[in-house]
Amino acid sequence: MRSAIGIDLGGTRIKALAYNLDTEEEIKRTMLPTEDGQFFDEDPAWANSIRELILEWETHFGQSVDSIGIASPGLTAKDQRSIAFMPGRLAGIEGLIWEDFLKTSAKVRIANDAHAALLGETWKGTAKGSENVILLTIGTGVGGAAISDGHLLRGHLGRAGHFGHISLNPWGNPDICGTPG
């Protein structure tokens, strides 16, 4: 059985899904609290929760998974192995190389959460078959993504289609990252 694990790392919750790539069926699903700001040994508690979950599921399946996709807020590094920029929350995420941290043989890729949501919608969701799509995510934060002519727009800095951190009132209270209004 070829299998994959998808993880949505949010500001308040971690959602995870194990998927059989051969039958295209869900195997298992769970949700955990993020516990941002808490640490276990020297590692963030949320990162340890993800590592323990993957080990538990691999033991349950009796084999290692083939690939792991992690959707996270923030800007991904160009090589899609880590989050390059995530100010204000999820302490310890910037620069964390997931393949090394998870100690797994699986292929691990990181994506901005809005990008991942949009790719999922065009793969299996309501935007399946669409060539031009815009998606707005609203959760602990606000994000967005766009596909034009069938291609995910990333932009030079990975921010294309990203709606977060738009100042509506330059004299307003700052958000968690310090942007006013």
Stretch-by-stretch model annotation:
Residues 12, 73-76, 139-141:
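Short glycine-rich anion-binding loops that position phosphate/pyrophosphate groups of nucleotides
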Residues 36-51, 55, 64-68, 74-132:
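Glycine-rich phosphate-binding loop and adjoining helix at the ATP-binding site
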Residues 4-72:
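Conserved phosphate-binding loops in N-terminal lobes of ATP-dependent enzymes
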Residues 8, 113, 139:
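Active-site glycine-centered loops adjacent to acidic/histidine catalytic or metal-binding residues
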Residues 3, 15-20, 27-31, 38-43, ...:
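Glycine/GP-enriched mid-protein hinge/lid loop-to-helix segment characteristic of carbohydrate kinases
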Residues 12, 114-115, 159:
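A generic "binding-loop/recognition-motif" signal
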Residues 25-26, 76, 82-83, 152-153:
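Hydrophobic "anchor" residues
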